[in-house]
Regions:
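N-terminal capping/lid subdomain adjacent to the active-site entrance of alpha/beta enzymes
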Residues: 2-186, 190-195, 199, 203-206, ...
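Structural signal for conserved beta-strand scaffold positions within catalytic alpha/beta enzyme cores
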Residues: 134, 262, 317-320
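Glycine-rich beta-alpha junction loops
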Residues: 38, 49, 267, 294-296, ...
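Active-site pocket-lining/capping segments in soluble small-molecule metabolic enzymes
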Residues: 296-334, 347-349
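Catalytic core of soluble alpha/beta enzymes
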Residues: 162, 167-299, 328
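A generic structural signal for well-ordered alpha-helical segments
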Residues: 111-112, 230, 281, 307
Length: 371
């Protein structure tokens, strides 16, 4: 299809509460919303890089610049035959996975819409709903955490992720497991630890966690260090920040760096890479699950479509809009369709697009391209 029009919006979205992780406190998130048009039809996509280069080297300022100055000019007015064709045209740019994903994801949504298929069908998925989990950041007290966990259990969420950082670590897990002895939990360290902390992770084995997500720093030694750690502990290691691409996951499998992989569609460069990674992991008996970057309902809906692929077997980080946002820019908002479940699209592409008034109010910068 020929790309007739392209609009890129850098948007700042206020969160409903202060979200606390090992990276610090977060009161808002920033994201890239992309509108792509071909032959009178259009679709929206989303890629949500961090707004500071903490989670990754890429961040919103650089992502927007790369999209506006380098990537969008390469595809506007061009006949793009496939998602791989689009990726090939952008291959001259190293890294910048969030920027690459912004265009590739939107291409997938538009192509599905033009073909009259819900996005999950275009990707090869088949489920009409997917299981989702609940996540809790660092809380002001253990009592507050227990109250929130009980609410999530009562609401039917099948698993809970707990943020884990120095000062909110072993004693927190011990208290949670004591109160909820049989529920499925895992922890997310957000790369806050080093190999010197191996004994801490060995102590966690007794608490029967589903996994430890990204325990060690994402640096040049990351895959080797995680492989060494996995040999020394029983709890499965899950890679997040270190699983940057299909090639990174191939290396992780060869080294034995993990037993689980978290796939964030934008972090790995889009839906094509996400699909390929989950297929590769399936070949090696490694389960996958969908991670989130605090996307709006637009990105969240796309994540739900991706989660229908067969090797996404652990409930994903796909949240009802009301969890992180008082007013989600994406409409219709994401809601639970059952106990711990989100429905997938019943219309071509996805149903979500931004509210026009909120888009105008919250846009930081906008770049527009026309043939």
């Amino acid at each position: 299809m020929k790309i007739d029009a392209l609009d890129i919006y850098w948007v700042k979205l206020p969160l409903a509460f202060n979200f606390r992780t090992s990276y610090g406190d977060q009161l808002y998130t920033e994201t890239m919303l992309v509108r792509m048009e071909s032959a009178g039809q259009y679709a929206w996509g989303e890629s949500c890089p961090p707004y500071v280069p903490s989670y990754s080297a890429e961040h919103t300022t650089g992502t927007f610049h790369t999209l506006r100055a380098l990537m969008a000019p390469r595809i506007i007015g061009q006949e793009i035959a496939s998602a791989q064709d689009l990726l090939d045209r952008l291959a001259f740019i190293k890294g910048n996975q969030f920027a690459r994903a912004a265009l590739e994801i939107t291409w997938w949504v538009l192509d599905a819409k033009r073909r009259g298929l819900p996005l999950h069908r275009a990707l090869g998925g088949s489920r009409d709903r997917v299981a989702v989990g609940a996540d809790f950041g660092v809380q002001d007290s253990l009592d507050m955490l227990m109250e929130k966990i009980q609410g999530a259990v009562d609401a039917g969420f099948p698993r809970i992720k707990l943020k884990f950082r120095p000062g909110w670590d072993l004693s927190m897990v011990e208290a949670v497991r004591s109160t909820f002895p049989d529920f499925t939990f895992h922890i997310d360290c957000n790369a806050a630890y080093t190999p010197a902390d191996t004994e801490l992770f060995r102590k966690l084995d007794r608490y029967r966690l589903a996994m430890i997500e990204q325990p060690l720093a994402d640096d040049v030694m990351s895959l080797i260090n995680h492989a060494d750690l996995q040999k020394r502990i029983e709890t499965p290691v899950c890679l997040d920040e270190s699983a940057l691409s299909l090639a990174h996951v191939q290396a992780a499998i060869r080294l034995g760096s993990c037993k689980v992989v978290n796939i964030k569609m934008a972090r790995v460069g889009g839906l094509t890479a996400s699909r390929d990674i989950q297929a590769l992991c399936a070949e090696h008996g490694i389960p996958c699950w969908i991670g989130g970057m605090l996307e709006s309902a637009i990105g969240g809906a796309i994540c739900a479509e991706l989660a229908t692929l067969p090797n996404f077997t652990y409930p994903g980080d796909i949240f009802p809009s009301s969890y992180f946002y008082k007013n989600d820019i994406g409409k219709p908002e994401i809601v639970l369709s059952g106990r711990g479940e989100v429905a997938t699209s019943r219309v071509p592409g996805i149903a979500q697009e931004p509210d026009a008034d909120l888009l105008k109010q919250w846009t930081v910068e906008h770049a527009s391209f026309r043939v």
